[in-house]
Amino acid sequence: MKEKREFRDYLSDIFDAIEKIENFTQDISFDAFVEDEMRVFAVVRALEIIGEAAKNVPLEIKENYPSVPWKEMARTRDKLIHSYFGVDLNVVWKTVNKNLPPLKDQISEILKDLGNTSS
């Protein structure tokens, strides 16, 4: 039987997926990225995981951290899942380089804030 997950698990999933994306895209140009099918697939999958995890974070947590782009994460996941063959890699690359660094900091802060509280 599947173990029940706590909301912190989903926050950790987001953080871990961001770190994986950082590793997948470290020291690589956009041109090299788009030519590397495995890397593209891995990054897109990690973005899907971020969005799916965001959907599972309780509303109370989302309301306590309104500056986190919860809806945007979920929408990105939906766009990737439902239009995979139409994925714009320019948008993916921009998301990776512009949106994920501040998101990583936000999720890290939330995890620190919630570290000593019970779920």
Swiss-Prot record:
Documented EC number(s): 3.1.-.-
Record-annotated active site: 77, 82
Claim: S-adenosyl-L-methionine is one of the keywords in the record: no
GO MF annotation: an example: RNA nuclease activity
UniProt motif (RX(4)HXY motif) ranges: 77-84
Residues bearing PTM O-di-AMP-tyrosine: 84
Cellular compartments per GO CC: toxin-antitoxin complex
Keyword Transmembrane helix (UniProt): no
Family: Belongs to the HepT RNase toxin family.
Biological role: Probable toxic component of a putative type VII toxin-antitoxin (TA) system, probably an RNase. Probably neutralized by cognate antitoxin MA_102. Neutralization may be due to AMPylation by MA_102.
Record text on subunit structure and interactions: Homodimer, probably forms a complex with cognate antitoxin MA_102.
Protein name: Putative RNase MA_0101
Native species: Methanosarcina acetivorans (strain ATCC 35395 / DSM 2834 / JCM 12185 / C2A)
Top-level taxonomy: Archaea, Methanobacteriati, Methanobacteriota, Stenosarchaea group, Methanomicrobia
